[in-house]
């Protein structure tokens, strides 16, 4: 129970290349957490002293790191970690990654960097010999087939593009068939698979 912790407040640092994202995170941090510092930078360019942070976590935060920079980013993550680290990240089977790849193929001519996957992260941790444990969870995001506006907004957020509406997604020769398979028995169903990766230096 953090409210009974002997060390209060719990100082919290925020890191993101987007000032908007940092501001949004700052709004929801509540006691006993207290924002002590903010870093508007990428993880791979982040500079800190070795083992600065007792705990570091990245919850669905590493998708946009290019594949060729992912190892550097993870090394920075581990460099700053004094005790424990936690990464929650979708696998290649997850809707989030699959749909983004279809989006790149269907609307960007195949150009663009696919989201990084949990499998890539695990492979790098193995290569750099970092002890870790993994727990896989699966779940589904579902809503009525008639909830078109909600689904449109959700899919736009998945690809960070609000210029393409649901109708265009459904008519596209690549995203369309994929989305058709996400409708079953009058329900939209988006299957997710997430790897929870626990790292420790203890």
Predicted regions, residues:
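A short SAM/SAH-binding and catalytic strip from SAM-dependent methyltransferases
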Residues: 53-70
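Residues at the starts of beta-strands that form the adenosine-phosphate
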Residues: 10-11, 84, 131
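Class I SAM-dependent methyltransferase SAM/SAH-binding core
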Residues: 1-46
